[in-house]
């Protein structure tokens, strides 16, 4: 597999270590990591899938407007939801517990909005995807909740849990992309890059 499209550099509009690791799995190392500073507050009555799609687009377009050189910008946003109830990105152990109490024993969805922009001089070509994965957590005991909250790995994670960490042991059912739950759906990422002429298998 080779990468082409005028050797345009990849810019990842995220400081997520998980997304960097996922890109490495498909043999991509970003030339730059530029986090997009945007307001991630959901709009009134905004659905989880619309929120993830909108935020990914806003991240990608913000970086595209900031850079002068040609590049391919990859942006994503992950949202965990129970029905239409959007769970926060946990900022404390208390919020981690709040999220896990909601998810305990319940089937829920993780949405990742993906937006890839190819900026070549003043021309922008955009690819957008929204991917959902259905999960069910086991019913968590108080001891399990206490233990997980003590790990701090759910801090700054959508829905208060790091699916590639200990929280993976809570999953009793999953349907859909695992990489999507980690923060970047690889199937859709590769297909989008391929449609932009970035990937060649020759």
From Swiss-Prot:
One of its GO terms (molecular function) is nucleoside triphosphate diphosphatase activity. Keywords: Cytoplasm, Hydrolase, Nucleotide metabolism. It comes from the Bacteria. GO terms for cellular component: cytoplasm. Its EC number is 3.6.1.9. It holds the Pfam family Maf. Belongs to the Maf family. Its cofactor is a divalent metal cation. This is Nucleoside triphosphate pyrophosphatase. The active site is at residue 77. Signal peptide: none annotated. It is found in: Cytoplasm. It catalyses: a ribonucleoside 5'-triphosphate + H2O = a ribonucleoside 5'-phosphate + diphosphate + H(+); a 2'-deoxyribonucleoside 5'-triphosphate + H2O = a 2'-deoxyribonucleoside 5'-phosphate + diphosphate + H(+). InterPro entries: ITPase-like_fam, Maf-like. Nucleoside triphosphate pyrophosphatase. May have a dual role in cell division arrest and in preventing the incorporation of modified nucleotides into cellular nucleic acids. HAMAP family: Maf. Its main location: cytoplasm. CDD domains: Maf. One of its GO terms (biological process) is nucleotide metabolic process.
